[in-house]
Amino acid sequence: MKERKKKYVALWQVMQRECRRLVSRPLYLFCMVIAPLFCYLFFTTLMDSGLPQNLPAGVVDMDDSSTSRNIVRNLDAFSQTGVVAHYSNVTDARIAVQEGKIYGFFYIPKGLSAEAQSQRQPKISFYTNYSYLIAGSLLFRDMKMMGELTAGSAARSVLYAKGATEDQAMGFLQPIVIDTHPLNNPWLNYSVYLCNTLIPGVLMLLIFMVTVYSIGVEIKDRTAREWLRMSNNSIYIALAGKLLPHTVVFFIMGIFYNVYLYGFLHFPCNSGIFPMIFATLCLVLASQCCGIVMIGTLPTLRLGLSFASLWGVISFSISGFSFPVMAMNPVLQALSNLFPLRHYFLIYVDQALNGYSMAYSWSNYMALLIFMMLPFSVVHRLKEALVYYKYIP
């Protein structure tokens, strides 16, 4: 009984020591509170309109007829496209694209109206700058739709001239009507698409780096032995006492972004907020344990921080929210399971978007639990580094 009491006392003393270190170093305040809050506000306000609006586009109207002017007005009416300039030739429009003044231009050839009425199949061209993927894709979609509508309008006029009724003309032009229903994000809101994974990913990256730094700086400042002595030479008590205050702070930040996204901004959350808060707690604990593995594998502050930043940044690319994992190379598909953010993303899809029960995501919760068990493989190596390793500047 006394032995257990001594362990609790040692744990409390280590926690008090770590709390004093947290409040005495502004770096901790910045990385654990200020940086996450800044990222929350930055990403959500950066894409507050959901989709980019009025992307600058140009028009080269060589026909200058009532038909071509009507096409330009209709193109400008699309919410994502804003016609900001008219050019006299393709060369000037191309130069404007290269200079970044516009993201694309719509080319209407001379004689469009006359050739359309005489059924000589005039060609409409449009050019978009795919160096900017989102802007180029949105402009391409609008310009392609405008081209199809123009072709349909010309064909409908010909059918009307031949005596077809409106129903007959529309049945010929569009024999199959497509009714689209985007699931989970029907507004096609980029903020919903990105922020639900970017914000937890940034928090995970900061947890990696703060965990590695808080342990590595003990080696650098040669206070590791004092830390171990305070924990009765138990590496488990030492790590628990050091990281529990971090867990509390990061979990509070996690609760805050969940309330902010799903309560204040009303992002889709079909299973309720509590499963997402639990998933956030699992992500925080898994990220801390990964940080222990990183500094235990490379017990040098420089190498440990490099490992943490590299692993954290790769997580954004391989987690599957920007490019589907199923379309990746099979090797990368397997490697994606080595990143906690990947499993959090799958939980988010199941819980928040699809509204499934937590039992449906049991494999992802088990994966995060396995991440929490990983420090047991490096604790003895880490303890040796804390006792014997000498930091070389």
Predicted regions and their residues:
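Extracytoplasmic/periplasmic domains immediately adjacent to an N-terminal transmembrane anchor
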Residues: M1-Y190, A385, I392-P393
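Alpha-helical membrane-protein architecture signal
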Residues: Y8, W12-Q16, V192, S231-N232, ...
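Residues that define the loop-to-transmembrane-helix transition and helix capping
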Residues: P26-L27, Y236, R302
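Alpha-helical segments in transporter systems
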Residues: Y28, M32, P245, S363-N364
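Hydrophobic alpha-helical transmembrane segments of multi-pass membrane transport proteins
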Residues: F38-L41, H181-L261
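Membrane-spanning alpha-helical segments of multipass transporters and channels
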Residues: D64, V248, I252, F256-Y260, ...
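Cytoplasmic juxtamembrane interface segments
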Residues: R120-S137, P182, Y213, G291-V313
